[in-house]
């Protein structure tokens, strides 16, 4: 026994409490949802542990949560007979936030209360939400399997510190008493509390009971009335479940405040029997890019909770999917290691992956506006799909959205089906360009001929795009073609060159040889091009060579890569090229050629190895 001690909250807890009390006040009734949700989790954990140790039930296997209030003392109590906590667990769970990235998350919070409320909601406030309506919270708990004298008392005013002490508690589980702030008497009203519980907790499998007091023969008789359906929502028939119930269940399992964009509820019977309920959130979780954070579904086996974040059932590129799977084919004592090597798991993963992709395809078809919300939140994650899941590339490709020259907007709204439907007669390929930004892609000289011919080009500017396009090779039988790479199909688009122009071009052949001699092995090849209308020169790469954006990706990852060898393509009709060709002075000629090459490299890469030399060269030529 350690006796009473007063401890300081972890600094992040203090910050979270302050933000939460101010940001969530307009939605304060959610504290009851959060506390009942925690009680439900405690019951799930007890059921799971009792599979291997039935003695943990201590002769009481009827799990429930009870809500009562004391109007005289202005307290509201939520009590469960779930797994309970020992002293160390109380300190870990109620005094600290054991989530990586918490500090940076809190630092990102600002003064925008609506935004803060959403962010805190997706962070998952849980127990601390009690302080929205209470100025003091008392907890009495005992872990299942411990003796009565190992109970723990915890109390705090939600400011800088809390008190923890040893107590005797005969029954296992956790009892949380909220000492309500002035003006919160609404939560001492029987009808009000019932309506909140019905609204938020009808879907959970744990019975929620409210205290009833009746006068009989001059005595007060206390009884407990169940006020929720207490049937796991996913086990009910879809036809019986209202949208509001699906939305509330999502908020319960995802600890999110906003409704999901869509969901898919399915029961499968036959070779494998399982029920899945999958949701697509409306906003990305704050820690979606945190590599330490686990993403996955809740796993139930025959309606018994087994684990959170079972990541084996969903590929990484669909890690935003929330929900659960309830399998009849896995053993109750299943572990993460068993899941890793299970044929059942692999089959379920394949089925759930297809189900999620179908759900997204349906959303895109039925509600373009909602799908655009999804794309803005999760498009970058979905773009990991072609590299990760070769078996579903066609399905993933249908879900991708791009900016393009057709829309003249940086918004990524164009689907590949849209693009193919607008292809010109005789066009065989889907043209795209990758660049560091939308502006750089849109203004690239590589687009000049295609714009002139009215051929649409997809404008890709996310860092992942170049990598993705290595795995996205075709769609609907049409190959993808980077316009920054040498390609006959683009060259064929150029207008037929008349005899006079051919003669003029032939006369310039010695100029090409002079350029080759000057540049040597700094470029792979020098040649004329008819791709350009306004630009004097560009650099391209061969189809099988590494492109500029891929080289940048490797460099950003700290890997040394061989230098990209460019093809230097000159526009024979451009006045600057003609001037360079007419220059006989070798020093002056060198300046013109170097300027044209630097311009081309700057347009392609966005940077030069020696920008100062480029500036000097431009200034010298301007002074003429």
From Swiss-Prot:
Region (B): 337-552
Gene source species: Enterobacter sp. (strain 638)
Name of the protein this chain belongs to: Chaperone protein HtpG
Major localization listed first in the record, in broad terms: cytoplasm
Region described as C: spans on this chain: 553-624
GO molecular function, one term: ATP binding
SUPFAM superfamilies in the cross-refs: ATPase domain of HSP90 chaperone/DNA topoisomerase II/histidine kinase, HSP90 C-terminal domain, Ribosomal protein S5 domain 2-like
Domain of life where this protein originates: Bacteria
Annotated function: Molecular chaperone. Has ATPase activity.
Gene Ontology CC terms: cytoplasm
Pfam families attached to this UniProt entry: HATPase_c_3, HSP90
Keyword Nucleotide-binding set for record: yes
Keyword line: ATP-binding, Chaperone, Cytoplasm, Nucleotide-binding, Stress response
């Amino acid at each position: 026994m350690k006796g009473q001690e007063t401890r300081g909250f972890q600094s992040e807890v203090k910050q979270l409490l302050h933000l939460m009390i101010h940001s969530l006040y307009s939605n304060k009734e959610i504290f009851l949802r959060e506390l009942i949700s925690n009680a439900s989790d405690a019951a799930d954990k007890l059921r799971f542990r009792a599979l291997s140790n039935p003695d943990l039930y201590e002769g009481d296997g009827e799990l429930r949560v009870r809500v009562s209030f004391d109007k005289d003392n202005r307290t509201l109590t939520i009590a469960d007979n779930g797994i309970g906590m020992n002293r160390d667990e109380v300190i870990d769970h109620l005094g600290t936030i054991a989530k990586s990235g918490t500090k940076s998350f809190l630092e990102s919070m600002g003064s925008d209360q609506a935004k803060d409320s959403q962010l805190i909601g997706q962070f998952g406030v849980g127990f601390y939400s009690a302080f929205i309506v209470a100025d003091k919270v008392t907890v009495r708990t005992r872990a299942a399997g411990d003796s009565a004298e190992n109970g723990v008392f915890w109390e705090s005013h939600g400011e800088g510190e809390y008190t923890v002490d040893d107590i005797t508690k005969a029954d296992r589980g956790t009892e949380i008493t909220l000492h309500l702030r002035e003006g919160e008497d609404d939560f001492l009203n029987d009808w009000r509390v019932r309506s909140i519980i019905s609204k938020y907790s009808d879907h959970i499998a744990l019975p929620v009971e409210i205290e009833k007091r009746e006068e009989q023969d001059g005595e007060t008789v206390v009884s407990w009335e169940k006020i929720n359906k207490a049937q796991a929502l996913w086990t009910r028939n879809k036809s019986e479940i209202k949208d509001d119930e699906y939305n509330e269940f999502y908020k319960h399992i995802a600890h999110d405040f906003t409704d999901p964009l869509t969901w898919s509820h399915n029961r499968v019977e036959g070779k494998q029997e399982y029920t899945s309920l999958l949701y697509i959130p409306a906003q990305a979780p704050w820690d979606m890019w945190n590599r330490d954070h686990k993403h996955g579904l809740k796993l139930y086996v025959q309606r018994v909770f087994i684990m959170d974040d079972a990541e084996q059932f969903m590929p990484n590129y669909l890690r935003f999917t929330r929900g659960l799977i309830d399998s009849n084919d896995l053993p109750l004592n299943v572990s993460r290691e068993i899941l890793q090597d299970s044929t059942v798991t692999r089959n379920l993963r394949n089925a759930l992956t297809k189900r999620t992709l179908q759900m997204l395809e349906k959303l895109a078809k039925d509600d373009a506006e909602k799908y655009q919300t999804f794309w803005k939140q999760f498009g970058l994650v979905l773009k990991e799909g072609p590299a990760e899941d070769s078996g579903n590339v066609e399905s993933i490709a249908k879900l991708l959205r791009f900016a393009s020259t057709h829309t003249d907007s940086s918004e990524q709204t164009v689907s590949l089906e849209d693009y193919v439907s607008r292809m010109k007669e005789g066009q065989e390929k889907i043209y795209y360009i990758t660049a560091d930004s939308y502006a750089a892609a849109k203004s690239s000289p590589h687009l000049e001929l295609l714009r002139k011919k009215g051929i649409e080009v997809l404008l890709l500017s996310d860092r992942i795009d170049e990598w993705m396009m290595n795995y996205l090779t075709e769609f609907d039988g049409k190959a993808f073609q980077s316009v920054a790479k040498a390609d006959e199909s683009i060259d064929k688009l150029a207008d037929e060159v008349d005899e006079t122009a051919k003669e003029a071009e032939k006369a310039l052949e010695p100029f090409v040889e002079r350029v080759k001699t000057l540049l040597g092995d700094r470029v792979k090849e020098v040649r004329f091009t008819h791709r350009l209308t306004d630009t004097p020169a560009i650099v391209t790469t061969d189809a099988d060579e590494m492109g500029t954006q891929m080289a940048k990706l490797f460099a950003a990852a700290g890997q040394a890569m061989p230098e990209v060898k460019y093809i230097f393509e000159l526009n024979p009709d451009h006045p600057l090229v003609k001037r360079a060709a007419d220059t006989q002075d070798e020093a002056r000629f060198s300046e013109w050629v170097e300027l044209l090459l630097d311009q081309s490299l700057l347009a392609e890469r966005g940077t030069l190895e020696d920008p100062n030399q480029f500036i000097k060269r431009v200034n010298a030529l301007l002074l003429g």
